[in-house]
Amino acid sequence: MANYFNTLNLRQQLAQLGKCRFMARDEFADEAGYLKGKKVVIVGCGAQGLNQGLNMRDSGLDVAYALRKEAIAEKRASWRKATENGFKVGTYEELIPQADLVVNLTPDKQHSAVVKAVQPLMKEGAALGYSHGFNIVEVGEQVRKDITVVMVAPKCPGTEVREEYKRGFGVPTLIAVHPENDPKGEGMAIAKAWAAATGGHRAGVLESSFVAEVKSDLMGEQTILCGMLQAGSLLCFDKLVSEGTDAAYAEKLIQFGWETITEALKQGGITLMMDRLSNPAKLRAYALSEQLKEIMAPLFQKHMDDIISGAFSSGMMADWANDDVKLLNWREETGRTAFENAPQFEGKISEQEYFDHGVLMIAMVKAGVELAFETMVDSGIIEESAYYESLHELPLIANTIARKRLYEMNVVISDTAEYGNYLFANAAVPLLKEKFMDSLQAGDLGKSIPGSAVDNAQLRDVNEAIRNHPIEAVGHKLRGYMTDMKRIAVAG
C-alpha cells in the first residue's frame, strides 16, 4: 500500500488540505434519522468506542460491538465494558455481515489488521467509518469500491464526548467522505447522521477531508498539544529546581499550572490568557513568546514538512514493525525524569499565583499555539481546522497532566500522538536549553515579575498584536458558534 496523499497531484493535495466548511445547524434537521433502523457495529471498545456507542444508542441507533474471539473468550476489558453497559457483543463473523455501518475505533496501528479482517465479511454496499484518517491517508488502505468510507472525528477525548452529550450538548466534530469510496453518493448523509448521533451537531461540525483531518491532527498533537507541554514541563521544572525552588512546589506549579492557564485560553483565547497578567508581566510574556517563536519556528516547520511528505508516518510505522522499541524506550525515559518523580506539594497555590509565577509557561503556550496555527495555515490547512487542532484541544490535554503528570497525558493520547510527542520534545528540550533557558530573568518563572513603569505606547502595541493575531479572530467566531449552539441545545 502507498501513502494515499502522495499519490495525488499537487492540485488534488491542495484541494483536500484546504477542505473545511462550517456546517449550518439546519443541515442536521434530520439528526440521526438516516441511520435509524440500520445496524451499526463498532469494532473496538476503548474510550472513543464505548462513549460514541453510548451516545449513538441514546440517539436511537441499533449499536453492537464486534470483538476478537480471544477478547470475548478471555473476557478482556473491551468485552467487560461493552457487556456491562448492556450492548450486544459478538465476533466479527457473527456481527459484521449484518452491519450497515462498521465503525473502526481501534488504535491506528491495528487498523490495517482490522480492515483486512472485516472487509471480506462486510455486505455489499455497507459503509466503513473511522474517527481518524491515518489508515486511509498515511497507510493508504485500499477499501472495496462498493463500500462507502466516512469519518466522524470528535475533537475531544472519548470521555468528554459522553459527558457533553449527557449535558445535552456535544463536542466540535470534523466529518469527511473518502472521495475514492462513495459509490452511492450517500457518504455525507451517513457522516452527518453519525455525527448527530454523538451530539456533535450541537457543538459545531466542520465538513473536512480525510487528508486535512490527518495532517492537521498529527501536527497539533506533535507540537503544541503534547510535545510543547512535555518539553515545557521538563524544562520549567528543571529550571526552578536548579535555582533553589522546592521540588514539590515546582512540580505543583507546573502540573496544575498548564490546566489553570489554558482554562483562560478556553474561555477567551490568547487575549484573555494574557489579560490575566499584570501589565509588566504581560509585556515580558509577550517578549518571551516572540523569542520562542523565532527559535522554534524551524522545528515546527520540520514537523509539518515530515507530516506532509509522509516521512513521519513511515518512521513511526517502521517502529510499529520493530515492536515499538523507540516508543517504549521514550516512554520509559519520561517515567524516569525528575518532574515525574518529584514529591507532592501539600500547600495551596491560588489561581492567580499560577499566572503570576508562570509567565514563562504562558509565553510557551502563546508561542506554541500561534506557531502551530501559523505553520498549518502556511501549509494549506484552513484556519478553522488549524484552530481546532491547536488552541481548542489544549485545555483538554492540560487536564490530563493535572491528573497524573506526563504519565497520564501519554496514557490517554493515542500511540500515534505519543510517538510524535516524544519526537518533538526530544528535539525541543536541547534546543531551548542551548538557545533560550539561560537568558531568563527573575520573575519569569516561580516568582512574580517586579513592579515597574509601563510605556503606554508599548502596551497598546502589544495588546493590538495579541488581539489581531488570526487565531484570535477565528477563535472568537468558533467559540461564539459553540456558545450560541449550547444556548439552543439547552433551550430545546
UniProtKB/Swiss-Prot annotation:
This is Ketol-acid reductoisomerase (NADP(+)). Mg(2+) 2 binds at residues 217, 389, 393. Involved in the biosynthesis of branched-chain amino acids (BCAA). Catalyzes an alkyl-migration followed by a ketol-acid reduction of (S)-2-acetolactate (S2AL) to yield (R)-2,3-dihydroxy-isovalerate. In the isomerase reaction, S2AL is rearranged via a Mg-dependent methyl migration to produce 3-hydroxy-3-methyl-2-ketobutyrate (HMKB). In the reductase reaction, this 2-ketoacid undergoes a metal-dependent reduction by NADPH to yield (R)-2,3-dihydroxy-isovalerate. Its cofactor is Mg(2+). HAMAP family: IlvC. It comes from the Bacteria. It comes from Yersinia pseudotuberculosis serotype O:1b (strain IP 31758). Residues 209-344, 345-485 form the KARI C-terminal knotted domain. It catalyses: (2R)-2,3-dihydroxy-3-methylbutanoate + NADP(+) = (2S)-2-acetolactate + NADPH + H(+); (2R,3R)-2,3-dihydroxy-3-methylpentanoate + NADP(+) = (S)-2-ethyl-2-hydroxy-3-oxobutanoate + NADPH + H(+). Transmembrane segments: none annotated.
